[in-house]
Amino acid sequence: MEYNKVIKNINNYFFNLSVIKYIFFILILSYVVFLPFGFLFNNYEYDIGGPQSIINASFLGKIFIGSLLAPIFETFVFQYIPIELLDKIKIKKNKDFFVLIISSLFFSLTHTYSLIYVLYTFVMGIFLSYTYILYKKKNFHPFWIVVIIHSLRNTITTFILFLF
């Protein structure tokens, strides 16, 4: 099976998933993809860093900032603005791929706490940008679907870090 056909089949599969199933799938996938990065964090970096305002915040502060404010702000800045602007450019071939990479690159370059974290957030940026593009094509609230995924991801991670 050729590469373009595989991509098209995957895209069709995601397009036909219900919103709840898609969100669940992307959340699970985001943690599966994190596994090799987790190995790198544990073996090569003791602290990935992060913004001091979040590191020093209380648990509720971390939830408020990381699960509400950051996802809304970052979705607006790193998915909505670049994707909507780049969507207006007349590119005939692989436009979605180009837009996805640019948006993901912007997202990852603002998470420069460590090189490994930049690489990990680039992959997360691909998931979030893909989601925005997909739900824009479905004409079903792409901004809020991305915010929900990002919020859930950050909330789950905050609870995991709090418990362990």
List the model feature ranges, each with a label:
Residues 31, 35, 63-164:
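Transmembrane helix-loop-helix hairpins at the membrane interface
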